[in-house]
């Protein structure tokens, strides 16, 4: 799905609305979400700031740096990057030139942390220092032979390999994954829109799975197909991880687990029907936050959907060094990120 159609289909339901969860959050209230050993206590106030001074539009993605700080990426050009401490206190902001800021990836490059920002509007991927100094800009991938103009390329996410190779997901364009070396030189492309196993449909996210240390692989979102797909690092298709009913965003791996925001439920499209899903090391769903309890039939999950009106359109999750989870939401009334703390 291209970015223009994606916005048009969803904006009717949510444009301009200020929204709050369908719960009371008084002093003594507590909302616990999830299943099995992945249950969390919800805090909707964690990231709130003075909207006049530090506004957000869409809260797209979040990462934690080595100092323990939480970085939020928004497409609000007054402050594209907002930096919090783990208690939700504002530390710093930067960025005024990323109107389509969408994907945020952190990478440790020879001891220095760098960021990769995907900008939908600029049709570029921008590499920066942790404080916003630009280091590299990747333009539209004409080297692939698959694109005739920048507008056809709408990157949504990156993943960076240990050798510095850059994988860019063109999730709102032609659904290719484009691989570059650390210098930004083109290596190959794969995926692309289609109905074969190796193809993708809304390749919204990508990450590198190091859970099998000797055999890292790529896990790539095929959101409109409600699944992740696994590929070799050279782009060869391996398998599909089916998640019926779940419009999953990027996969985020922490320890043995894979976490993902689910933008919306298939049975309630464009009705603020998102939730969060968690998979174990065998890529089996073990918990859905604000969603159905996971049930498997013949090795595949039964259709999953939102069961509690907590989130609107969750767009990303960030897991910190204490296993807390932070949720960024798209097109959700300019809400700031939520925090969820593990419940034992």
Regions found by a protein language model. Give the residues of each.
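Surface-exposed loop and turn segments in beta-propeller and other repeat-based domains
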Residues: 44-53, 136-149, 187-198, 286-309
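Blade-loop segments of beta-propeller domains
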Residues: 79-82, 86-109
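Conserved beta-propeller blade signature
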Residues: 70-72, 114-116, 166-167, 217-219, ...
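Loop/turn-rich, solvent-exposed surfaces of beta-rich toroidal or solenoidal domains
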Residues: 246-292
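Beta-rich, blade/repeat-based domains predominating
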Residues: 53-67, 98-111, 143-165, 195-217, ...
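Blade-level signature of beta-propeller repeat domains, shared across WD40, Kelch, NHL, RCC1
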Residues: 313-344
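N-terminal export signals
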Residues: 5-25
